[in-house]
Amino acid sequence: MLPTRMLADPPLSLYVHLPWCVHKCPYCDFNSHAIKGGLPEAEYAAALLRDLQQDLPRVRGRHLQSVFLGGGTPSLFRPETIALILDEARQCLPLIDGAEITLEANPGTIERGRFAEYRAAGVTRLSIGVQSFNTLHLQILGRIHSAQEAINAAEEAHAAGLDNFNLDLMYGLPQQTLEQALMDIRSAIALAPAHLSHYQLTLEPNTLFHAHPPALPDDEVTWQMQLACQAVLCKQGFNQYEISAYARNGRQCGHNLNYWRYGDYLGIGAGAHSKLSDLQQGRILRLWKVKQPSAYLRTAGTAQGIGAITDVAEADRIFEFMLNRLRLYEGFSPADFELATCLPYARIHTALEQAQALNLVQKTRGRWQPTPTGYAYLNDLQARFLPEVSTPATPRLRPTVRA
């Protein structure tokens, strides 16, 4: 463990989970629940505020650099409720100047003028879940919106003065061709987003797609989709700063950057996770709230509302740091590792040199980052830092699944 005098609190973000959606998509493994009978909006907002008050002693005196309202479908909540949540957060935890406040939105839930109302409530950034502009693929993915509604949502964001918005897109979809994947990218670029997230569809456990797998494009086709879309985005002025994230004009997602840099985050809401550093003790804590919304509504703000609290073991800190930081194109320095993990750089130096000998990582101006080969086999590179796992002599020839 490093001396505490050498350490400073990592940046802190707030995640607010709003778990309800109109319809559970067959690929979604998030803690989301289709609305049955009505949205308990006021009751849930009150539970969130109790939850936040309970967690304050863990982060008192710190400032928030970002807030992210995720789900579920946060755009189901009225702007007045979003304003209430954000106002309470500001009173409890000061926000830094220019703090990023993101709200996730489903194009199928947006009425005219709604984004302007969210902006008035304090939202500074939107993340719009488009996934595809192809009618067949939207149906296969179980999305409730049409391609035109996705276009309308982006235009509404511009009209509201929320030009800093992200579009989520997926590729490697059932029955998708390379040209269709490129059409999705071109359609997204035409809407002038500041940010674009481009994820490969994966079949996650506890989803309908996992139980009844659809036929997906083969690995070679999916790889070509990724490379071709990547080339189009870069040509159009999008800078790839993370495996699946692209930004124009420096408008990276500050909230996700804090995750990927192994910063701290406080999570409130059903199933929300937190990662918090206790530098005086040289500890990193993880805690999460009960998952079921009905149980959360009953127990938020009490000891019963916390599902578990655990200490992150030193070996797990190493893996978690590398799992996240290796996704970023900015690389990391030895000091970045020490400040984020409270551990000496010597704990990873040998493993990095071994990976360097295999052309998986490189060191440039004092910063480590994957090589092109390392990014292509990122899962294998990350696995070299798993606790108590003997590392393979050479990488396995399997492209990384980008998600």
Predicted feature descriptions by range:
Residues 4-13, 32-58, 62-343, 394-403:
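C-terminal scaffold of the Radical SAM
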Residues 356-366:
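A short, conserved structural fragment
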Residues 367-371:
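Minor-groove-contacting beta-hairpin "wing" of winged helix-turn-helix DNA-binding domains
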Residues 375-403:
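Short, amphipathic alpha-helical interaction segments positioned at domain boundaries
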Residues 342-354:
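Short amphipathic alpha-helical interaction segments
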Residues 19-32:
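Local cysteine-cluster metal-coordination motifs and their immediate loop/turn environment
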Residues 14-18:
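Short active-site neighborhood of thiol/selenol oxidoreductases, capturing the structured segment around
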Residues 168, 316-323, 349, 372-375, ...:
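Non-catalytic, well-ordered alpha-helical scaffold segments
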